[in-house]
Amino acid sequence: MKLILTAAVENLGVAGDIVEVKNGYGRNLLLPRGLAIVATPGAEKQIEGIKRAQEAREIRDLDHAREVKAALEALEGVTIAVRTSESGKLFGSVKTDDIVDAVKAAGGPNLDKRAIVLPKNLVKTTGKYQVEAKLTDGIVSRVKFEVVAA
């Protein structure tokens, strides 16, 4: 099935790309969610409009991402208070939502929880940590925080 993407789809493409996908993937996921439209000659005109809008959005996003990166790197005192055992192990682990809330509480910028990249070994003990926040393609900021016992 030949489709035109209307939004960025991970491992497939960005808005405006013409892609060939299996029929079930197109009919059951991409089309119902509005992530793609069926490729027709008339739809190619829509591609031009989507690409123009995307270029303008990328310029705005790039400037905004640079501002957010500077704010995150200047941010200090981000702490996350969680319940722990006597040995310092957490009951559960620190999640991206917790990091976003802590950054916001410390006076930092609003982040999307999907931008935070947690390490393979999840945060399960108290201490100081550093994670990456992927703001846009090519702009990655480091977020430093400390996990303390509540």
UniProtKB/Swiss-Prot annotation:
Keyword set includes rRNA-binding: yes
Keyword tags: Ribonucleoprotein, Ribosomal protein, RNA-binding, rRNA-binding
Gene3D superfamilies found in the cross-reference section: Ribosomal protein L9, C-terminal domain, Ribosomal protein L9, N-terminal domain
GO-annotated molecular function: rRNA binding; structural constituent of ribosome
SUPFAM superfamilies: L9 N-domain-like (SSF55658), Ribosomal protein L9 C-domain (SSF55653)
Family: Belongs to the bacterial ribosomal protein bL9 family.
Annotated NCBIfam families: L9 (TIGR00158)
Job of this protein: Binds to the 23S rRNA.
Name this polypeptide is given: Large ribosomal subunit protein bL9
Origin species: Corynebacterium glutamicum (strain R)
